């Protein structure tokens, strides 16, 4: 089966890695998480990179990794939440594959990430307010780059995976194994 690339974007805690890994498994494709790949290359966790190189240093590494990963063929990639901040990353993603925006509201994201110390942008006095700020800034960028938007609020991971596969099948991008899924929380982006 010929499959193009599938890229997941969204804020931290939206489920990009979990859903992306499951979609890759169902499509029998290799899966990559851009943050994990950066960590493997550097030999340290993302918070350490932020501490030593600052956010801009990390973003430089991220752009290089996004370029490398999106240049491959037949892969599923979960991007870091801030990958869409740079125009070149948005171009790599939009032009080299199908982009799925896993959208979650800031409250749900806060509940999912509040105990995670590996999220440097949330190590603030008010992480909930920070998530609301990040959502306000990034949501338009995610929508700009996305081919599909999937709301992650209520569905289970299995339902989200089926929703992604259904959208890819309807768009003629893949012919996945039989999967029935709800469609009420999916919207097509032009």
Swiss-Prot record:
> Under the GO molecular function aspect, what terms does this record hold?
ATP binding; magnesium ion binding; shikimate kinase activity
Positions of ATP binding: 13-18, 119
Keyword Amino-acid biosynthesis tagged: yes
- Leading EC class: transferase
Against InterPro entries, the record matches this protein to:
P-loop_NTPase, Shikimate/glucono_kinase, Shikimate_kinase/TSH1, Shikimate_kinase_CS
Record's cofactor remark: Binds 1 Mg(2+) ion per subunit.
Task: Please indicate which superkingdom the organism of origin belongs to.
Answer: Bacteria
**Reactions accelerated catalytically:** shikimate + ATP = 3-phosphoshikimate + ADP + H(+)
What does this protein need as cofactor? Mg(2+)
Pathway field: Metabolic intermediate biosynthesis; chorismate biosynthesis; chorismate from D-erythrose 4-phosphate and phosphoenolpyruvate: step 5/7
Q: Where in the cell is it found?
A: Cytoplasm
Q: List the disulfide bonds.
A: none
Taken from the record, one Pfam family name reads SKI
Q: Which UniProt keywords apply?
A: Amino-acid biosynthesis, Aromatic amino acid biosynthesis, ATP-binding, Cytoplasm, Kinase, Magnesium, Metal-binding, Nucleotide-binding, Transferase
Subunit and partners: Monomer.
What family is this protein classified in? Belongs to the shikimate kinase family.
What function does this protein fulfil?
A: Catalyzes the specific phosphorylation of the 3-hydroxyl group of shikimic acid using ATP as a cosubstrate.
Show the PANTHER family listed in the entry. Answer: SHIKIMATE KINASE, SHIKIMATE KINASE 1, CHLOROPLASTIC
What is the designated name of this protein?
Shikimate kinase
Question: Coding gene?
Answer: aroK
